[in-house]
């Protein structure tokens, strides 16, 4: 066999190996950077109103991993036992380091879109809707998590801050 034939054969083998390696990498599932938040988190929250004293209440936040893509469904339920209730659901999809999705406040019947970024310990997103806009930052490590919501317009409240535990 000629040297040219060996060179072409070797190139074909290398190209084939590269194609197989690329296909194997493409088939590898993408790691979900928010998976460490999955589970049920319980704790206390403080709402700072636009005027008047702060109010404290209990919160339960659950995160369910999505089956169709990297990301989570966040269910946020806060209640002071008397006047304040918040039942919100957020669908979060991760694309690279971006977070997109939709949110819904089930008590006030409002909803909107989600856009933000993955952070080293969670995510920071903007909640945009017709009647409500805010930023939300979630950070969780080990057994501890913090959730902070800052509305763009502080007609009702200026800040909602929760400290949660999973363990």
Where are these regions (language model features)?
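Cleavable N-terminal signal peptides
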Residues: 13-14, 24
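Central antiparallel beta-sheet cores of small beta-barrel/beta-sandwich binding domains
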Residues: 27-139, 148-167
């Amino acid at each position: 066999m000629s040297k040219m034939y060996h060179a072409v054969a070797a190139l074909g083998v290398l190209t084939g190996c590269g194609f197989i390696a690329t296909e194997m990498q493409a088939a590898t599932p993408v790691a979900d950077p928010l998976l460490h938040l999955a589970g049920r988190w319980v704790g206390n929250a403080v709402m700072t109103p636009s005027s008047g004293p702060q109010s404290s209440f209990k919160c339960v936040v659950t995160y369910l991993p999505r089956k169709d893509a990297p990301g989570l469904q966040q269910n946020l339920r806060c209640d002071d036992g008397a006047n304040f209730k918040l039942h919100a659901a957020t669908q979060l999809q991760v694309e690279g380091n971006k977070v997109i999705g939709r949110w819904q406040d089930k008590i006030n019947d409002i909803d909107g879109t989600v856009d933000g970024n993955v952070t080293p310990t969670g995510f920071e997103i903007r909640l945009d809707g017709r009647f409500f806009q805010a930023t939300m930052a979630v950070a969780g490590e080990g057994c501890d998590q913090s959730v902070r919501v800052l509305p763009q317009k502080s007609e009702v409240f200026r800040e909602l801050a929760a400290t949660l535990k999973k363990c």
